């Protein structure tokens, strides 16, 4: 899991901006996240996978953070 500091940076980023580069805790996935209508969608940069989250907490718990 990411540090509390990085998790807080991720939360703060999306309070100010609707779009951001993302990295996964495994180090194997990178993507771009867009926040619309309070939901978070991450498009994987390596393939066509898309990950959707209802909350920021769910996104963080799944191992994603701002890059």
Name these PLM-found stretches:
Residues 1-67:
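Terminus-proximal functional modules
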